[in-house]
Regions:
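Central helical "cap/lid" subdomain
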Residues: 219-260
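Flavin (FAD/FMN) cofactor-binding and adjacent substrate-gating region
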Residues: 93, 104-107, 116-186, 191-192, ...
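N-terminal export signals
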Residues: 2-23
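Dinucleotide-binding Rossmann-like beta1-alpha1 core, especially the glycine-rich loop
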Residues: 71-149, 267-269, 277, 298, ...
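N-terminal Rossmann-like FAD-binding beta1-loop-alpha1 element of flavoenzymes
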Residues: 30-54
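C-terminal catalytic lobe of FAD-dependent flavoproteins
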Residues: 319-404
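Active-site lid/adjacent beta-loop-alpha segment flanking the redox-cofactor pocket in flavoenzymes
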Residues: 256-354
Length: 404
């Protein structure tokens, strides 16, 4: 931790005398644990709203799930049911505002998607019809239009693809850092590496959190801790059932422009950033034989040669659809851990056991970060509960809809 951050954190640690339960927005002290894109968005919205925010993370900004995400901003057919699709639509819409306000480069242009199976293609067409009913400008694009959409992509025998024109993609590490910088501009303290270790409660009200950096007096604690399933139990007194799965993200060196859309092809996801780098994401999870070595949830491969092998494997799949990518070299190949609440929906809200602890855990964190940050900050600062978030509360029945 650099000297400037240490001095600022020392100031945050020294604050005393503010009442917990009656804290106003101007005086409310909030510790946000987790400096991924969701935690960063919440921190920015809180700081902008007048709260006194400290952001901690045991490693640093975007070092866990947000680093290893494909970073597809979308409200596609997979966002079910209607209430979750609407939330995702608002997330996409808020990205337009956020990108402009914080100068975050988003590559808009939409996504195209198709499957190998005829049955799955038929179901995709049905799902796109539902998307249209839900207000999306999505459509099935016939084969004769595909070359104009993506001249470099080989579609093989497929005769239609789904086009979702509102989708975009972003560099999640850059976006997270822009949000944190903006939060700091509103007075937030950023402390990395700084691990959450304990919380102190008096009369059921939060008094402070204990970290590897010291004791921080706080009125609220936000757990934006992604795939760390043990932390809600320890700090919020509640279990969040989730299946945390690894996925590999490979990022090439800058290449000539060759993709216009996010391409979701059988076995591989691809998109090209504005700087020319192509991001590859795999669709399949790790084989059972890898479970032992993945038990510690590493973000890095044990050897560079192993990372290179995975990159080349993904490149071979990508070459089937994008021959021009042949010969690409990778800058980064790493493992991302996806927090997947069992019903597939975000967890947003105060713990019923410890109301001063607010949970914000979700898959599709990139798509939802702007709207989740806005809603979470509003609930924390005002003390109100937004009816729209009732279906996402941490004490819901996760078995009603089991997706993961």
């Amino acid at each position: 931790m650099d000297r400037r951050t240490l001095l600022k954190l020392a100031g945050a640690l020294a604050v005393t005398g503010l009442p917990s339960r009656s804290a106003t927005a101007a005086g409310m002290r909030v510790v946000v644990a987790g400096a991924g894109i969701v935690g960063a968005s919440i921190a920015w919205h809180l700081a902008k709203g007048g709260a006194r925010v400290t952001v901690i993370d045991k490693a640093g900004p975007a070092s866990h799930a947000s680093r290893g995400t494909f970073a597809w901003i979308n409200a596609t057919w997979a966002k079910q049911p209607r209430h979750y699709h609407r939330l995702s639509q608002d997330g996409v819409s808020n990205w337009n505002t956020l990108a402009e306000e914080l100068d975050i480069p988003v590559r808009w242009g939409g996504s195209i998607e198709w499957f190998d199976s005829a049955d799955r293609q038929a179901r995709l067409a049905q799902q796109i019809r539902e998307q249209v009913e839900w207000g999306e400008p999505a459509r099935m694009v016939p084969g004769e239009e595909l070359a104009a959409l993506e001249p470099e992509v080989e579609f093989g025998e497929v005769d239609t693809v789904a086009l979702s024109p509102n989708d975009g993609a972003v560099d999640p590490v850059l976006a997270t850092n822009r949000l944190l910088d903006a939060a700091r501009d509103f007075g937030a303290t950023l402390a990395f590496p700084c691990e959450l270790e304990d919380a102190e409660f008096g009369s059921n009200a939060l008094e402070a959190v204990v970290t590897s950096c010291g004791r921080i007096e706080a009125d609220r604690l936000v757990l934006a801790t992604g795939a760390a399933a043990d932390l809600p139990r320890k700090f919020a007194g509640i279990d969040i059932p989730q299946r945390t799965t690894p996925g590999i993200i490979a990022i090439t060196e800058p290449l000539e422009p060759m993709l216009n859309h996010i391409v979701v092809a059988p076995g591989i996801h691809m998109h090209q950033r504005g700087d020319g780098r192509i991001v590859l994401g795999e669709q399949e999870g790790a084989p059972d034989t890898h479970q032992a070595r993945l038990r510690g949830r590493p973000n890095e491969f044990p050897l560079q040669t192993v990372a290179d092998q995975h990159g080349e494997r993904m490149l071979a799949i990508a070459r089937r659809f994008l021959p021009a990518i042949d010969g690409a070299r990778f800058e980064n190949v790493y493992i991302g851990w996806r927090p997947l609440p069992l019903d597939g929906h975000p967890v947003l809200g105060a713990s019923p056991e410890r109301p001063d602890v607010y949970l914000a855990i979700m898959h599709s964190g990139v798509s939802l970060a702007p709207i989740a940050g806005q809603f979470a900050a509003r609930e924390i600062i005002s003390g109100e509960t937004l009816p729209r978030l009732d279906v996402y509360r941490p004490d819901r029945d996760f078995e009603l809809i089991r997706r993961y």
